[in-house]
Amino acid sequence: MKKLAFIKRSNGKHWVGDGFPVRSIFSYSDIAAEMSPFLLMDYAGPADFPPTERKLGVGQHPHRGFETVTIVYHGGVSHRDSSGGGGTIGPGDVQWMTAGSGLIHEEYHSPEFARTGGAFEMIQLWINLPAKHKMTAPGYQG
């Protein structure tokens, strides 16, 4: 039988940009040594958004040396990055972004979801790349 290493309690919800009300399941600063290679896991939602013409989400920001895996349960997310990657994912879809040597990206509610509004729910996991792969070319799969 394995011994329980720790119990992690949530630090509460916070907003990432103006479109993602998240609760950090774990983060690098909390339990990095115990969770390697996982850096962070954020759970967004469930939240209801009214229809809007505004772009809700998080604008351009840099990443380097890790990958993000995003799964949408309700709603839709559109991604665009400086390597030319991008796309829109909806319920049941997965997006995998490799930041590698570095990129700038943005994520917003998809235009379709913004127009209709409704329930939004997703999860995002950040995975540290091994040292020998940190300078790999950026990439996107969605």
Placement of each model-derived feature along the sequence:
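Short, Gly/Pro- and small/polar-rich lid/capping loops
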Residues: 1-12
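A short glycine-rich, His/Asp/Glu-containing loop-to-beta-strand
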Residues: 14-73, 122
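Conserved, well-structured core segments that form or line functional sites
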Residues: 121, 127-142
